[in-house]
């Protein structure tokens, strides 16, 4: 039975629902279950699910699930392509407007916290243009020192940007440092638009684990299941294409990078498993750090039953729908 919301024209602002949380907390299952009973459309907010042919290692909903529960922003890029934060912001605004136009509510589900934050803060502000002298200085540092030196500089100046930029993504590290040296403000500071008022009534939920230990154990079990379901073969097909490399954003996804190193004989099979689990746990810690500092968040427990979770979500939405 579909639970009806009040008429949309009565809302002061159109409704948008966030369902966030660390990896392996069953966000997708909850979102798909909600779609059975609420007038919603699902939108993926996951920087890994955008890639075609990367299904097992990203824990993407199955083809059958996607057929029954379509998700916007899933399978929209080839692994050779990139997808910037700016592109996401433009796409998500169009998608939200479309969903509202068909009298549905967008439910944004995923674990890429920076994408959620961008929607709350109004996108990326105008960043300073590149400065040739500063860029030359940074390139000289890169040549004389190393990419690790530059990344550590970024970590000390702008730890939030360092959390979301991989140290191998040298161009983005350089750009973040360049922005700071030109403007005197970090990329994170410049991305927070002052006095931005969202045009949406955003109700935010996070699905949180009962403990880190519980989640880490689940991550281990899940990765072993991925291996048994053909994850190695999935990455091997990408590896054999010949046009992909490990510094692409797609191949830097957790698990794919480590399996790539295994194929390049940089890791043993056992080390690949160990490093994949370590990388996943680092990702989880980063996600939890974001969420622990998040404002106006309705926290749900992943150990709760689906029935109870749905009841709580509907109750919170009804309480906030005319705010």
UniProtKB/Swiss-Prot annotation:
A Gene Ontology biological process noted in the UniProt record is: tRNA modification
Indicate the annotated site residue(s) for Interaction with substrate tRNA.
112, 135
List ligand-binding residues for ATP: 21-28
Q: Which Pfam families match?
A: IPPT
Region: Interaction with substrate tRNA; residue ranges are 46-49, 171-175, 252-257
Assigned EC number: 2.5.1.75
**Which residues of the sequence carry a binding annotation for substrate?**
23-28
Q: Which cofactor does it need?
A: Mg(2+)
GO MF annotations for this entry?
ATP binding; tRNA dimethylallyltransferase activity
Which reactions are catalysed by this chain?
adenosine(37) in tRNA + dimethylallyl diphosphate = N(6)-dimethylallyladenosine(37) in tRNA + diphosphate
Q: Which UniProt keywords apply?
A: ATP-binding, Magnesium, Nucleotide-binding, Transferase, tRNA processing
Q: Which proteins does it associate with, and in what oligomeric form?
A: Monomer.
Q: What does this protein do?
A: Catalyzes the transfer of a dimethylallyl group onto the adenine at position 37 in tRNAs that read codons beginning with uridine, leading to the formation of N6-(dimethylallyl)adenosine (i(6)A).
Protein family according to the UniProt entry: Belongs to the IPP transferase family.
Mind telling me what this protein is named? tRNA dimethylallyltransferase
Species per Swiss-Prot/TrEMBL record: Buchnera aphidicola subsp. Baizongia pistaciae (strain Bp)
Gene behind this chain?
A: miaA
């Amino acid at each position: 039975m579909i639970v009806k919301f009040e008429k949309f024209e009565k809302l002061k602002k159109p409704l948008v629902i966030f369902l966030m949380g660390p990896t392996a907390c069953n966000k997708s299952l909850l979102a798909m279950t909600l779609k059975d009973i609420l007038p919603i459309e699902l939108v993926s907010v996951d920087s890994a699910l955008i890639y075609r042919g990367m299904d097992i290692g990203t824990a993407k909903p199955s083809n059958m699930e996607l057929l029954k529960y379509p998700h916007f922003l899933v399978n929209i890029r080839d692994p050779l392509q990139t997808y910037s934060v700016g592109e996401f912001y433009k796409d998500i605004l169009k998608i939200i407007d479309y969903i509202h136009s068909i009298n549905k509510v967008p439910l944004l589900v995923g674990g890429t916290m920076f994408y959620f934050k961008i929607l709350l803060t109004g996108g990326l502000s105008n960043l300073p243009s590149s400065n040739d002298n500063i860029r030359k200085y940074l390139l000289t540092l890169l040549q004389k020192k190393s990419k690790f030196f530059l990344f550590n500089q970024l970590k000390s100046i702008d730890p939030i940007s360092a959390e979301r930029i991989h140290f191998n993504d040298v161009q983005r590290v350089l750009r973040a440092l360049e922005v700071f040296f030109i403007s005197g403000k970090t990329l994170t500071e410049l991305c927070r638009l002052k006095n931005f008022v969202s045009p949406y009534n955003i109700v935010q939920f996070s699905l949180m684990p009962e403990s880190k230990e519980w989640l880490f154990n689940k991550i281990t079990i899940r990765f072993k299941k991925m291996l048994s379901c053909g994850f190695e073969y999935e990455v091997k097909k990408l590896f054999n294409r010949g046009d992909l490399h490990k510094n692409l954003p797609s191949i830097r996804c957790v698990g794919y990078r480590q399996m790539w190193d295994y194929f390049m004989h940089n890791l043993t099979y056992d080390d690949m498993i160990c490093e994949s689990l370590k990388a996943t746990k680092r990702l989880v810690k980063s996600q939890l750090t974001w969420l622990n500092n998040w404002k106006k968040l309705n926290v749900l427990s992943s150990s709760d039953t689906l029935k109870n979770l749905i009841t709580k979500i509907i109750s919170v939405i009804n309480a906030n729908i005319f705010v």
